Amino acid sequence: MDQMMMGAMSKDMMSMPGMQAMDMSVMQACMDACSACEQACTVCSTQMMSCAPACMNCADMCNTMMRAMMRMQGMNPATMMSMLDACMAMCQMTMDECMEHADHSEVCKMCAQACKACMDACMAMKDMMMAMS
């Protein structure tokens, strides 16, 4: 998504009751990382059959996480924390699988890097949510 649309979306989300305390830059970074990881995993799944199932599952999880963050209003914080944990676990598994091929596959290397960035962003999101509670 382009910056103008994301800025407008963040502004709209900030107007929702209960969202004012949310650090939208952390949330936006997590959504961006999930989107990038979804794309990298989708590309990787078409290139390396040995890691295709992990990559496809990770892409789906990242997409689900990103979409859930877009509609956080009314989301149970414990559920969101569990989803972030699941996303990080899926990214870790996929990163580990892709690292086995990273020395001879640039696609797997990029996928592993995207998974790591997504894990880091999900952890930052969790930290921010815990600080709010």
Stretches with model-predicted labels:
Residues M1-S133:
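Amphipathic alpha-helical hairpins
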